[in-house]
Every structure is written in C-alpha cells, then in structure tokens.
C-alpha cells in the first residue's frame, strides 16, 4: 500500500513479515526487497520527493536515502500554543446522563462527563462530588435513607464501587470488586443495606454494604445488543426481580431471593417479558410483555425488518388468595353517614394509592395545579409474600393500555406505574421533535394518561412522589398545550410531582449549570486507559487474538505525552487497537476543538470540462425516476441549462479557468444562486438562471451509476436479466432490494450487485428471497391466461452476484450465504473480510468511543470464517483503471456473461399456458359389467343419510 516512485523503483508498505515495513520493487530488475526492519511500531505512511523517501513510524518522520539504504529521524520543531489543551473550567450541563433522585426529591444526582453532581430542587448550590478529570465516575445512585450516594470509579485504574456521604464532606469509601470490569444498573435496597448491580458479562451481583462483600445471584446467558436484565428490589428488600433470556431468546421474568440466591422463573417464555417493577404496596409485580415479539428475537437479521414488536402492560398477583386489582366495580349508595366500603372492590383492597398518594382525577389530561398535598411521611413497611405455585395463572393483562413500543417501566406510589413509549417526532404519540412519551397508569382510575413528551430518560424518588426526567429538546408537558405536540423543552432536567396532574410544558425545569475543572491531558490518559479496558472486557474472544495486550498498552502509552489534539488521541488508540487485528474496532468522536466552518459548499450536480478557458457542462445529473428524495439543481423543471452550455458567472462574478468553480459555489448550498450561462463561451447573449445548489452530489451520482448499470445489463442481456443494486444491509439496502428486485420479476434471471456494500444487518431476507423456488401455479383468467407462479413474487432463473474488496461486514456475510447455499455464481474480487458484530461497548466520558466487537462468525463445521479472510469470488475479475476510464465495467460485463451462460444451461422453463380445464363435475358412466355382480343398492332418496 501507499506506493511512491523514486526513479524506476516503487517504494511501498507491506506487513508480509508481520509488521508493516517499507519495501521496494525495482521495475527494471524486477527485484523485490525489504527496506526497513522495524519490529515494534508499524510504518504508517510513505512518500517521496527530491530523490528521497520519507515515512512515518512510531510518531516520527524518517528520511530514507534510496542509494545507501540508510534512514534517519528528521528533527522537526513546530511550536504551538495548543489552547484547547489548557486546563479550564468547562460547562458540562449538556452531557448529563444516568439521572437519579434523592429519596424525597430534594436533590438530583447525575453523571456528566465522568463527574458526579448533585443539584438542588430549589435552594442551594450544585455540588461536584468527584472533581477529577483523571478518572471516570459513572452510574450514581442515592440510598433510600438519604445518607449516601454510590457510584463506580476507575480512579485506581479499575472500576470500584464508591460509597460517599451525600454532602461530599468526608472521604469516600472504595470497595474493590472481584474480576474488575464495567458495571451497570446500581440500585440500593429499600433498607439501604445492600446494592445490586450487573457487569459486562451479564452477571447480577448483590453487595452487602456493611461488609463490602459481593456475590452473584443471577445471570443472563445470552448477549444481545441491549442490556435488559434491569434488576429491581422488592419493597421489603428480600427479593430481586430481573429479566433474562431463555434459550428461545425470549425474555422471561425471574425472581431471586436476595438471601438464599434461589431463583424462580415467573413467566413461561411464551411471551417476551421484561421491564419488571414491584408495586409499592408489595402485592403485585408489574412488567411489560410482547406476544408478537417473534422475529424480533433475531435482532441481527434483516428478516425482522418491518415487523414491529409491541408490548402490553401486565401485573402478577404475588400471593395466592389475593384478589385481582381489576375485579368488577359498582357504585352502591350506603346511605348518609355510612363509611365507604373497602374490600376487594375498593381502592384499599386493590393496593390503590391512599389519600394524598395519587388519588387525584385526571379527566381530560391538563388541569390547573391542585393545592399542595399534605406532607407525606415515609412509606409504611410492607412484607412481600410470593406463592410461586400457580403464579403464572395469576398474571393479569391490564385492559385499556394498547400494545405499543413500551420500555422503561417504573413503579411509583402503590398502584401506579410509569413507562416510556418510543416516539420520534412529527405527530402520532411521539414528542414533537423526538424522544419518548412518558405514560402513567393508576389502578385508582384504571386507565393510562400521557404524562409528558420528549423524554430521553426518567427516574422516580424512593417515596414515589417526585419524578425527574431529561428532555430531548423536542417535546413538552402533557398539560398547558404540550399534549402530543407540546412546546419545546430543551435537553434539560425537569423535576415534577409524580402523583399529581401531568405537568405543563416546561414546568419544573432545573436551571443549574454544571461546571468541572477539566485538564485535557489527564482526561486523555483516562480515555486511553478506558479504550484499552474496553477491548479487554468486551472483545468477543478472551485471548485478544493472541496479542500481548498488556505489552501493547505499555508500548503505545509511551506516545501519550506527545498527544496534543483529541484527533491524535483517537489515532493513538486506533493504532493500539490494530494490534488485535480485528475489523469494526472503530475509534471515533470525542470533544474536538471548535474550528470555523463554512456555511456549506454548493454543488450543481454536473460534470465539467474546460473549453476556451471556460467551464463547459459535460453532463447533468438528474433524479432519474421515482426518487423524490433527490434534487438535481440543473435538471429541475424550468431551469434553462443544457449539456454543452458554459457557466460564465456565478452570483455575478466572472468564472474563468484556471479559477476553481467551487470557490464561487462556497456557501451556496440550499441557497438561491444566479448562474450566467450561454451556449457559447462568451458573455454576449448569455442568460441568467436561478438554481439552488445541493450540499452533496453523492446520492445523485450513485443513482446515476445504478441506473446506468441497470440499462447496461438490460442491453447486454437483451432484456432477459434484472439488475439489482444493494448498497448495504441496513434499511436502505433492504428498500433498494425490494424496489428493484420485484419490479423486474418478469426477467428470467438476475445480476445482484453488492459492490461497496457498507453492511449493517445480516441479509438473511435477501438471500432467502434469492434462494426461493416456486411450487406450482395458479391460473389467470385475464388476458392470454398466462398463469401465476406460486409464490407469485420472485425471479426463478439463475442469479449472479458481483462482489468487490469494498464490500464488508453484512456485505461479507451476504455473499457467504449466497455461496454456501449454492444460489449462484460470485463474480469480482474477494470481499473486505470484516464479519464481526458490535453491540454495547461504553462510550468515553467526552462522548467518543472505541468499539470492541462482541460476536464473531464461524461456519457449520466449527471454523472461524470470513473475518480477516473475506469471501472469494468464483470468477475473479479486476476492474482495472484503464478499462474503467475507457467506460467499461469488466465485473458487470462478466457477470452478465455468466448469467446468460447459466440461463442457457438451466433455463427456468416457466409454463405459459394452463392445462386443459378439469372435468370434475362430469358424471361418470358406469362400465358394463363383464360378470354377474351383487345386486346394486337402490337409488338414494333425498334425505337418506347414506
């Protein structure tokens, strides 16, 4: 790679000896030689000039003398101020996440850029409990007794559990955890004596606060992209409910005894049950369940597309003999002075909210604020009794709650639950500009009500009376005109009464500003260490592909003091990750220094040639057919511009070669721009046209390439082969396949082009359709009575797939499946070779990330496959620059040739006529007997049962 000429010799980088070094090839002597022999850091780039070769290695620039073969490090002195590397006070308010509340909602605790802050509801100051850019503190949780805040901290180099007094005035207590890794979902028991949490390996832990000892009490045996255990404590601190995958990949609800560790499965696995929550009254276990989960269980696969899974609200009655909370109700007049009846039909008997705990009516949604409720005391202690025998038969579906895309179920005061519905702006039940809808359901009135929109996450106080939510910036309160399209609320925190009427739009907004003292050098080291740990803890195999990962860290850490820009930190972490030799180990993002940006360069959707010192239009790209999302500036109706015209001025400024046309188009994207054009390269007689340049031509040029290929296949095959392009294995690829494949099912075969496929999901749906055969016919009573195939949708002749080295991930797996199932012929070049999937690697404190692949592919014979290997074609064809420049596509042309050969060898041979009409209604004529026979039965009379 990276070739550079010096005379007749080409210098380039090759890792054929295991480390990327400089090699050379003498084109006259036809001699190959290794030039450098580094054994630690790879050579990264090579260039040449003035008879010398320069290259980068280990962060230094080296100069190589081709004659002597000697190289030396070039001394470069470049002084810079690097203002972005100065320690400073940083506003991190916009980075709040993992929000939580004090027991009664007097203060809020959040994580923001690796710091733990508490925020007053009304009075007081913001407190930063951690104050260290050199470490990451995550996932705060407030103890129900109000005394402590716990969080995880990597200050020691590994994550530990930290317990700190809520005012932050005393040194915190650090608790080392076995097999240190990344931790999730911390939750204090209601009695503040234990803390539960989960880890990278999907184990459920319970830690005794007094002793600091932790033990596992449950696990999820299947790793899928979302972490869905979501463990929760029972009100009496005796039980933990969590969800775990069964071998069917459906979730079931489990309950574990926190003392004994005994696990019991609550749901039977015939629904996908998760997001469990204990009712505060101790009588019920709420959860969400889906009976249409089905294809959603195969989360990686395209077959699950267009199959939306919805969830309903359910409630399990824990104790045998406890009445259903939904028994029929009837208003009965007891006479003046009579006390209200209780029993199973009243609120008391159903575990409903007592006075002052959510009994307020919600008719019509938004109402004026009610008077302040009576001050509340602590919850009455409850004892949770669970009769596991017969428990599945005591599960109740909650009526009046339509099945939707629910998640994040939480329990408030007794008889009240909250849950999010996925929404995405633009009407419906989603917020006006994104985020989810928060719903509340109360047994007291047996109905759900929309509580607030535009929610990113929410939390309830331990007493259930306060609700904190983080907005997305596009929703609003359910009251005061918020509704389903409420006023914008901004990405901020809102603290509202949980058991009162839905809040007005913007009500309860917390205006605190979170600031931390940020030393970028310290934060860079923490991010570097975290990237290393992420690979150690999340990589799909434990052996790090055989590399010495500890040694790798030590080697690359030497360069860390020289890193003076966030992009350079990404580069360093990426180089370290390359030692594992794995695809999808992407390093990206982070808090980059702000730089001035252009308002957007404009593009005209055209190719140009220089003629007579002017820019001449050589080609105009249009939107082709049926592409409403495309806009072609020069092909719009009414724009009087044609191929061969000259663009003489842009915005009144003269345009002549060698001036760059794009200089005059800078800042014109999506803005009206006046062009002066003429059929001749002179201003005299020119005309002015107003166009609106686009910001990108990629979609226009891609569509033109696709349609050109389709027409070429149509021409070369005499209309017998379809052409289908699949850009990726995500939604765009799914849509492109469905659009082009079925629209051409009148063809006899197909050329499927997946070159440059960007991957996404596993394209089982596409491969299944390509493999599909038909089983017979149904006749057609119209036209020439050409019959329908059964199934009707498909192309039944040969298929050829074109692949190249720029197709990877899902673009690797699709041709692998195509080849493995012997559907057809692969033509082109070996694919990229990156077949692992990614999932849940945590982000860095500044929003960047380093992905650790979470799953690798191996074949049915037990061999790791495709990763670092790719899928080889059956017919190897290179698209050489010479042939492409000449207007040819050798891979496409060879694919058509192969398709036509297969079509001749194995034609589909579809029937074009139906058989002779059947005569099933014709009465048969009995044959004349040739020998005496028994007397025949008398004719059957009407009504005779024989």
Question: What are the roles of these predicted feature ranges?
Answer:
Residues 18-23, 62-64, 117, 158-162, ...:
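Structural motif
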Residues 245, 289-308, 321-346, 354, ...:
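Short, conserved, GDST-rich strand-edge loop motifs in beta-rich repeat architectures
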Residues 5-7, 48-50, 103-104, 144-145, ...:
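Residue-level detector of Asp-centered blade-edge/turn motifs that repeat once per structural unit
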Residues 599-657, 730-731, 855-856:
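PDZ/PDZ-like domain segments forming the peptide/carboxylate-binding groove
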Residues 624-634, 648, 653-845, 883-890, ...:
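Cleft-lining beta-strand/loop regions that shape enzyme active-site pockets
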Residues 1-6, 15-17, 24-44, 66-94, ...:
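Multi-bladed beta-propeller domains
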Residues 561-616, 683-691, 696-709, 896-932:
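Extended, small/polar residue-biased N-terminal targeting/export presequences
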Residues 10, 53, 108, 149, ...:
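Hydrophobic beta-strand positions that form the internal "hydrophobic ladder"
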């Amino acid at each position: 790679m990276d070739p550079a000429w010096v005379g007749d010799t080409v210098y380039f980088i090759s890792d054929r000896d295991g480390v990327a070094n400089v090699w050379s090839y003498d084109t006259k002597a036809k001699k190959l030689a290794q030039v450098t022999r580094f054994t630690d850091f790879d050579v990264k780039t090579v260039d040449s000039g003035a008879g010398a070769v320069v290259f980068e290695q280990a962060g230094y620039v080296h100069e190589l003398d081709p004659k002597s073969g000697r190289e030396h490090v070039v001394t470069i002195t470049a002084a810079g101020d690097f203002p972005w590397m100065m320690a400073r006070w940083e506003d991190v308010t916009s980075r709040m996440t993992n929000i939580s509340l004090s027991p009664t909602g007097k203060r809020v605790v959040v994580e923001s850029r690796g710091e733990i802050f508490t925020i007053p509801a009304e009075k007081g100051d913001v407190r930063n409990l951690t104050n260290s850019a050199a470490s990451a503190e995550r996932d705060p949780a407030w103890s129900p007794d109000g005394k402590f805040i716990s969080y995880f901290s990597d200050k020691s180099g590994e994550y530990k559990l930290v317990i700190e007094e809520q005012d932050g005035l005393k040194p915190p207590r650090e608790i080392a955890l076995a097999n240190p890794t990344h931790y999730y979902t911390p939750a204090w028991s209601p009695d503040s004596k234990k803390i539960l949490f989960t880890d990278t390996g999907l184990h459920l832990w319970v830690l005794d606060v007094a002793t600091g000892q932790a033990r596992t009490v449950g696990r999820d045996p299947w790793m899928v992209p979302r972490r869905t255990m979501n463990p929760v404590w029972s009100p009496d601190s005796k039980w933990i409910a969590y969800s775990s995958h069964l071998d069917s990949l459906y979730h079931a609800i489990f309950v574990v005894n926190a003392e004994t560790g005994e696990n019991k499965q609550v749901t039977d696995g015939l629904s996908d049950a998760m997001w469990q929550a204990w009712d505060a009254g101790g009588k019920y276990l709420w959860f969400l369940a889906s009976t249409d989960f089905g294809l959603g269980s195969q989360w990686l696969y395209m077959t699950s597309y267009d199959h939306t899974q919805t969830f309903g609200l359910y409630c399990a009655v824990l104790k045998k003999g406890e009445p259903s909370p939904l028994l029929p109700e009837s208003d009965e007049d007891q006479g003046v002075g009579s006390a209200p009846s209780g029993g199973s039909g009243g609120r008391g008997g159903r575990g409903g909210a007592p006075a002052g705990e959510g009994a307020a009516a919600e008719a019509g949604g938004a109402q004026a604020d009610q008077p302040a409720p009576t001050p509340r005391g602590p919850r009455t202690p409850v004892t949770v009794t669970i009769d596991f025998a017969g428990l599945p038969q005591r599960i109740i579906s909650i009526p009046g709650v339509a099945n939707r895309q629910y998640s994040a179920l939480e329990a408030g005061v007794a008889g009240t639950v909250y849950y999010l519905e996925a929404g995405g702006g633009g009407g419906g039940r989603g917020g006006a500009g994104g985020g989810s809808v928060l719903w509340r359901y109360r047994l007291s009135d047996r109905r759900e009500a929309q509580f607030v929109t535009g929610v990113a996450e929410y939390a309830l106080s331990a007493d259930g009376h306060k609700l904190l939510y983080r907005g997305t910036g596009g929703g609003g309160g359910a009251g005061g005109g918020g509704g389903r399209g409420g006023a914008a609320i901004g990405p901020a925190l809102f603290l509202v009464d949980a058991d009162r009427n839905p809040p007005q739009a913007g009500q309860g907004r917390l205006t605190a500003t979170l600031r931390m003292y940020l030393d970028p050098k310290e934060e860079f080291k923490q991010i570097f260490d975290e990237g290393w740990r992420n690979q150690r803890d999340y990589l799909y195999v434990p052996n790090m592909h055989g590399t010495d990962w500890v040694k790798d860290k030590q080697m690359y850490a030497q360069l860390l003091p020289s890193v003076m820009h966030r992009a350079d930190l990404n580069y360093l972490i990426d180089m370290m990750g390359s030692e594992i030799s794995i695809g999808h180990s992407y390093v990206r993002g982070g808090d980059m220094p702000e730089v001035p940006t252009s308002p957007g360069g404009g593009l005209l959707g055209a190719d140009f040639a220089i003629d007579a010192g002017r820019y001449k239009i050589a080609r105009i790209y249009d939107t082709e057919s049926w592409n409403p999302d495309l806009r072609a500036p020069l092909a719009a109706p009414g724009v009087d511009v044609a191929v061969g015209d000259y663009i003489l001025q842009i915005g009144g400024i003269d345009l002549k070669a060698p001036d760059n046309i794009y200089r005059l188009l800078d800042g014109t994207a999506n803005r009206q721009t006046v062009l002066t054009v003429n059929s001749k390269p002179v201003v005299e007689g020119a005309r002015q046209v107003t166009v609106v340049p686009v910001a990108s031509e990629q979609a226009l040029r891609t569509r033109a390439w696709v349609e050109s290929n389709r027409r070429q296949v149509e021409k070369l095959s005499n209309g017998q082969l379809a052409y289908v392009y699949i850009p990726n294995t995500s939604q765009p690829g799914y849509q492109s396949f469905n659009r082009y494949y079925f629209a051409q099912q009148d063809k006899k075969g197909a050329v499927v082009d997946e070159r440059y496929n960007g991957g996404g999901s596993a394209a089982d749906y596409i491969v299944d359709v390509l493999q599909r055969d038909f089983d017979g016919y149904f006749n057609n009573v119209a036209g020439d009575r050409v019959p329908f195939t059964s199934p009707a949708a498909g192309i039944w002749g040969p298929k050829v797939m074109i692949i190249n080295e720029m197709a990877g991930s899902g673009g690797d797996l699709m041709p692998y499946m195509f080849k493995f199932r012997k559907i057809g012929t692969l033509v082109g070049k070996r694919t990229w070779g990156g077949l692992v999937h990614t999932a849940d690697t945590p982000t860095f404190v500044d929003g960047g990330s380093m992905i650790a692949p979470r799953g690798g592919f191996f074949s049915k014979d037990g061999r790791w496959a495709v990763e670092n290997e790719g899928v080889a074609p059956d017919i190897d064809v290179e698209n050489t620059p010479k042939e492409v420049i000449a207007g040819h596509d050798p891979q496409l042309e060879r694919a058509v040739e192969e398709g036509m050969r297969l079509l001749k060898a194995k034609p589909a041979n579809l029937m074009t006529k139906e058989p002779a009409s059947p005569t099933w209604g014709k009465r048969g004529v009995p044959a004349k007997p040739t020998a005496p026979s028994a007397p025949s039965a008398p004719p059957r009379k009407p009504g005779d049962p024989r």
